[in-house]
């Protein structure tokens, strides 16, 4: 349910325990409804499956408010406990320097909160936050950018960003049509006005698409942490911490491979 095996849960529990200001289990008085391990299964499982708090409450036979409280409390600690596994910009630059890089933009969907018009992503026809994903030619993710409002298109996310600095160190970069206009990213040919693409242009686009396939698979794999794939339902102010926790858990799990 948590997306982690027993060994991985052991380590997460150890890391979170070190971050707690007070012991989870008190020596006296009323005890918490769930053990720390159970609460971490809920918190990590919420990131993995994005099923409702009500269902988690039924699974553990507690109130929904208890589940919500534990997720709220433990998510920042999971974020902190897995932070070292999230690749930083310098680490990504070192990994991709002189090599071929792939880049893709993606959306992390969320509810349509009233008054948050900047979350509307016209390309996806829904609301959410967007990031850029950088991989090597094999599709290994080397960098996930911080999320920005969904109304920012890929070129806007790229301009002046850490991603741009990383990609400019690569030996070559391949992206989709969203990156047309840069002088360092190879993209498909856009259909010109007034005519169809020539056969050689179709062939070229197919080659670019084939080379880009690993980054698309990598994004799909990242989104097996379903909180990144289906609508984020918790309060908007909690999204960034939840996002970082989910990304951290993804790379934490990979470290056991």
Residue ranges and their predicted role:
Residues 27-28, 37-39, 203-204:
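A short, structure-level motif marking secondary-structure boundaries and short turns
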Residues 3-4, 31-34, 45, 123:
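Short secondary-structure boundary/capping segments within folded domains
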Residues 5, 35, 198-200:
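Ser/Thr-centered flexible coil motifs
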Residues 1-31:
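Charged, often Cys/His-bearing segments associated with DNA-binding zinc-finger transcription factors
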Residues 52-257:
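Short, well-ordered secondary-structure "scaffold" segments embedded in the functional core
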Residues 35-50:
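Short, amphipathic alpha-helical "recognition" segments used to contact nucleic acids or chromatin
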Residues 23-28, 50-57:
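Glycine-/proline-rich flexible loop or hinge segments
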């Amino acid at each position: 349910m948590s997306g982690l095996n027993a060994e991985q849960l052991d380590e997460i529990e150890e890391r979170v325990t070190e971050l707690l200001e007070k012991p989870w289990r008190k020596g006296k008085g009323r005890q918490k409804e769930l053990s720390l391990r159970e609460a971490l299964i809920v918190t990590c499982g919420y990131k993995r499956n994005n099923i409702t708090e009500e269902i988690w409450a039924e699974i553990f036979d507690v109130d929904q408010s208890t589940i919500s409280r534990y997720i709220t409390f433990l998510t920042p600690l999971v974020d902190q406990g897995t932070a070292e596994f999230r690749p930083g910009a310098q680490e990504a630059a070192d990994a991709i320097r002189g090599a071929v890089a792939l880049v893709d933009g993606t959306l992390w969907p969320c509810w349509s909160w009233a008054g948050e018009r900047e979350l509307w992503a016209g390309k996806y026809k829904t609301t959410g936050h967007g990031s850029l994903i950088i991989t090597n030619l094999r599709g290994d993710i080397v960098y996930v950018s911080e999320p920005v409002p969904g109304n920012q298109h890929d070129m806007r996310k790229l301009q002046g960003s850490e991603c741009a600095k990383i990609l400019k160190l690569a030996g070559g970069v391949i992206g989709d049509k969203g990156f047309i206009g840069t002088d360092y990213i190879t993209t498909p040919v856009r259909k010109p006005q007034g005519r169809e693409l020539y056969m050689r242009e179709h062939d070229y686009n197919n080659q670019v698409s084939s080379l880009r396939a690993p980054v698309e698979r990598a994004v799909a794999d990242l989104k097996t942490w379903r909180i990144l794939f289906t609508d984020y339902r918790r309060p908007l102010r909690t999204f960034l911490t939840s996002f970082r926790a989910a990304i951290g858990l993804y790379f934490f799990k990979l470290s056991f491979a």
